Amino acid sequence: MTNSKILICDDEEGVRESLKLILGDHYNLITVDSGEMALKALSNCKDVQIVLLDIKMPKTNGLDVLQEIKMKSPHLKIIMVTGYKSVETAAEAARLDASGYIVKPFKSQEILDTVKKNLES
């Protein structure tokens, strides 16, 4: 699994750095700070297996990015990592076929377990 490639998309540098610390020893990581950059990275890198995607970002809503990614790559695993705790937002992410939903602040083990589970499924 250490060769698995994960795209991290979050506008907060601290969150990106935390995820890099948690996942960097286990996976190959690409980090971007916007939905637009995530879409660009995915078009340039076809071997990404999982996307960790924030919802609230400047310019682009993560749910819109999720929907656009799923139209192009329906089998790509996308895990939402967000500060939104609402059932409605989680339900919308599930409806759009998100593979997981993690609320910030997150625990390292929660990230590792969710990524591992998605890689194995």
Tell me what each language-model feature is.
Residues E17-G24, D113:
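Charged docking surfaces used in two-component/phosphorelay signaling
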Residues Y27-D33, A41:
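Short hydrophobic/Thr-rich beta-strand motif most characteristic of the beta2 strand and flanking loop
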Residues S34-M37, N61-D64:
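Acidic catalytic/metal-coordinating carboxylates
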Residues K46-L52:
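Active-site beta3 strand of CheY-like receiver
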Residues M57:
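Receiver (REC) domain active-site loop signature in two-component systems and cognate sites
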